[in-house]
UniProtKB/Swiss-Prot annotation:
<keyword id="KW-0964">Secreted</keyword>
<feature type="glycosylation site" description="N-linked (GlcNAc...) asparagine">
    <location>
        <position position="366"/>
    </location>
</feature>
<comment type="similarity">
    <text>Belongs to the glycosyl hydrolase 28 family.</text>
</comment>
<keyword id="KW-0325">Glycoprotein</keyword>
<dbReference type="InterPro" id="IPR000743">
    <property type="entry name" value="Glyco_hydro_28"/>
</dbReference>
<keyword id="KW-1015">Disulfide bond</keyword>
<feature type="repeat" description="PbH1 3">
    <location>
        <begin position="362"/>
        <end position="405"/>
    </location>
</feature>
<dbReference type="GO" id="GO:0005576">
    <property type="term" value="C:extracellular region"/>
</dbReference>
<feature type="glycosylation site" description="N-linked (GlcNAc...) asparagine">
    <location>
        <position position="354"/>
    </location>
</feature>
<feature type="glycosylation site" description="N-linked (GlcNAc...) asparagine">
    <location>
        <position position="275"/>
    </location>
</feature>
<feature type="signal peptide">
    <location>
        <begin position="1"/>
        <end position="16"/>
    </location>
</feature>
<feature type="disulfide bond">
    <location>
        <begin position="392"/>
        <end position="398"/>
    </location>
</feature>
<keyword id="KW-0961">Cell wall biogenesis/degradation</keyword>
<feature type="repeat" description="PbH1 1">
    <location>
        <begin position="295"/>
        <end position="316"/>
    </location>
</feature>
<protein>
    <recommendedName>
        <fullName>Probable exopolygalacturonase B</fullName>
        <ecNumber>3.2.1.67</ecNumber>
    </recommendedName>
</protein>
<dbReference type="GO" id="GO:0004650">
    <property type="term" value="F:polygalacturonase activity"/>
</dbReference>
<dbReference type="GO" id="GO:0071555">
    <property type="term" value="P:cell wall organization"/>
</dbReference>
Length: 453
């Protein structure tokens, strides 16, 4: 009996070591060891002390620490913190399922960088049917906090080079590119202070997520190859999300600065700076046949939009096989635009559908209770004198559309033109139909250049 008892104790001890023992290069600092926390860089005035886990860093861009990172996440879960230290690089070369999280912090002060092994990632990823999206990893659970002064690096240049000339929404596209940061089935997620760099595709995608916030984040995507731009690198995309807050954030990318997508509610954005983007957009929605999509209860305030295609934009699909829905109760307030092609636009002829096709198969997405207030600055002049194009589909309702204190000019000349077609009721400012002969030339120019992503 003693032999069996000793054997059982030995087995139990071995299992305990396997689960709880440290892996090479790792250590755990207790929450009450303030001296050690300060020395490691984990002491933070704004965040409470926590049990802090440190893992080894990569010795080169080929040194994959995915297994170490996963171990560190599991060890820090349930009340701890994973510290990725300043001046160190952590290379991730394997897909990671992080949907088991509860009460965890990740302090990113170093660089977390994905490999650019295109064949591996295209064969090993998390796939989403919506617009054929894939991701390196996915984060889920509840009470997840990521903060620090470090960089989350998507290492996108190879992806940009190889995707050049292709289109993400082409039905024949098979070159899928990973999204940099994805949450799925997550509640109460916050991201603060970090930089998100060179995502291969969208920068952030939140799926079935509730109450997620970004504050003081810098999102940047650039290419060293002038013929291979960082396409489709949206700042924020959502699907089935309730509660998104973005504050004090800068976005310098090649697509939508902000783009809530189907079934997104309760969005708050304040102090957002966007350069070279496709705008602070709502949508697109209504893409899939027979599917109801909504975006509702959105407040966007104090936004600067520079050198982009669009400023404040709502977009919905049209065509023979599309869905239906609504964008309702959206306010854009105190929006500054400079050198922007379309400062204000309601686009119900999305995506890559010309005016003739759009007239034959109009959108079935309603735009209701949309306010544009205190919008000022200059267009690029590429659309002539048109500074706002508000054109509603004959199959949809556009009501409660209001413009207040609009001070927009165009280098193409004065007076600036606001176009409104198919809008129910008074919009609050003087506007002209696109059929007006004095505006037709500018409108035709605007729309000939608008039918693109």
């Amino acid at each position: 009996m003693k032999f069996f008892a000793l054997a059982a104790l030995f087995a139990s001890t071995v299992n305990s070591i396997a689960v709880d023992g440290l892996i090479p290069g790792a250590r755990v600092i207790p929450a009450n060891d303030v001296v050690a926390l300060k020395k490691a860089g984990a002491y933070h005035q704004k965040h409470h002390h926590r049990r802090t886990v440190i893992i080894r860093s990569s010795s080169s861009d080929e040194d994959d620490v995915s297994a170490d990172f996963l171990w560190g996440i599991k060890r820090a879960n349930h009340g701890g913190r994973l510290l990725l230290q300043n001046g160190k690089k952590y290379v991730i070369g394997k897909k990671l399922d992080l949907t088991f999280l509860k009460d965890i912090e990740v302090q990113l002060d170093g660089e977390l960088k994905f490999t650019n092994d295109v064949p591996y990632w295209q064969a090993n990823n998390f796939y989403y049917d919506f617009q054929k999206s894939i991701s390196f990893w996915r984060w889920g659970g509840e009470d997840i906090k990521i903060f620090g002064s470090g960089v989350l690096n998507g290492n996108g240049q190879r992806w940009y080079n190889e995707f050049a000339g292709q289109e993400i929404l082409d039905p024949n596209n098979k070159y899928y590119r990973p999204i940099l940061f994805v949450t799925e089935n997550a509640t109460r997620v916050s991201v603060e202070g970090i930089t998100q760099l060179n995502s291969p595709c969208w920068t952030n995608f939140f799926v079935r997520t509730k109450d997620i916030s970004f504050d003081n984040v810098f999102i940047h995507a650039y290419s060293t190859n002038a013929s291979a731009l960082p396409k489709n690198t949206d700042g924020f995309d959502t699907l089935n999300v309730d509660g998104l807050t973005v504050t004090n954030t800068r976005v310098d990318i090649g697509d939508d600065c902000l783009s809530p997508k189907p079934n997104t509610t309760n969005v708050f954005v304040k102090n957002l700076w966007c350069n070279g983007t496709h705008g602070a957009s709502m949508g697109s929605i209504g893409q899939y046949p027979g599917v109801l999509d909504i975006i509702e209860n959105v407040w966007i305030e104090n936004v600067t939009l520079l050198n982009g295609e669009n400023g404040a934009r709502l977009k919905a699909w049209a065509g023979p096989d599309v869905g239906y829905g609504r964008i309702n109760n959206v306010t854009y307030k105190n929006i500054h635009v400079e050198n922007t092609d379309n400062p204000i636009v309601l686009d119900q002829c999305y995506f890559n559908i010309n005016a003739t096709q759009c007239a034959a198969y109009p959108s079935r997405v309603n735009f209701t209770n949309i306010v544009f207030e205190d919008i000022y600055g200059t267009s690029s002049g590429k659309r002539g004198k048109v500074v706002a194009d508000l054109t509603c589909s004959p199959n949809a309702v556009c009501s409660g559309i209001r413009l207040k204190n609009i001070h927009l000019t165009s280098p193409a000349g004065s007076p600036p033109v606001i176009v409104c077609d198919g809008i129910q009721g008074d919009i609050g400012v003087e506007c002209q139909s696109s059929s007006n002969s004095t505006t037709r030339r500018s409108v035709d120019l605007a729309r000939s250049l608008k039918y693109r992503a």
